[in-house]
Amino acid sequence: MNNFFDTIIFDLGGVLIDWNPLYVYRKIFKTEEEIEWFLENVTTNEWNENQDAGYPLHKATEELVAKHPEWEAEIKAYYGRWLEMLGDQLHETVELLHQLKQSGKYKLYALTNWSAETFPHALKRFDFFKLFDGIVVSGEEKMKKPSAAFYKIIIDRYHLDPDKTIFIDDSLRNVKGAETVGITGIHFHNPSQLKEKLQRIGIELF
């Protein structure tokens, strides 16, 4: 079994990188309840995902301000202070990535839902990107997970065999999306759980 898989694809946010709007909005709002309401009703996940799929940040911001003028300053903070949302790398998972690279047995890729406008900031900040054999960014491709077509981009571009490929993501929806194109998915919860899952399916770690 340990000779079966030869490719591992990583999600970034929530797996290798700590990104969270709370880092900004805890400085703006007084209570967690206010933050929760704002993120669920104004700058929603669905809204942010549109930009992950390539919609321009300035247009998205202008349109949302027009819809919710009473929240203009708070809405503009979302992308205006985006760098403050970008936390540290998740060290234990990055260490796993290093171990996989050092083994020399696996091709390593990243497949991320991320705006093409903000992704360069992450690329500059984190050294571990050099470990990847390829990176596919939703904002550059104008499509995103869990669309089957998005997974097929990375398969076709790098000539991957889905049957020999593992995909790791903290979103179950995205894991299931990968499985629709024949990739083996792992729903990420924490580094220890990931390490156990990888070893269980025959991936060799130091």
Where are the predicted features?
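Short beta-strand segments
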Residues: I9-D11, Y109-N113, D169
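Alpha-helical elements of Rossmann-like donor-binding domains used by nucleotide-donor carbohydrate transfer enzymes
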Residues: Y23-V24, E46, K59, E63, ...
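Asp-based, Mg2+/Mn2+-dependent phosphohydrolase catalytic module
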Residues: M1-F5, S115-A116, L123-F206
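Substrate-recognition/cap helix-loop segment adjacent to the acidic, metal-dependent catalytic center
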Residues: F29, T93-E140
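N-terminal helical cap/lid subdomain that shapes the substrate entry/recognition surface
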Residues: N2-E95, S115-T118
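Generic structural signal for small/hydrophobic residues in well-ordered secondary structure
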Residues: D11-G14, G54, A110, I135, ...
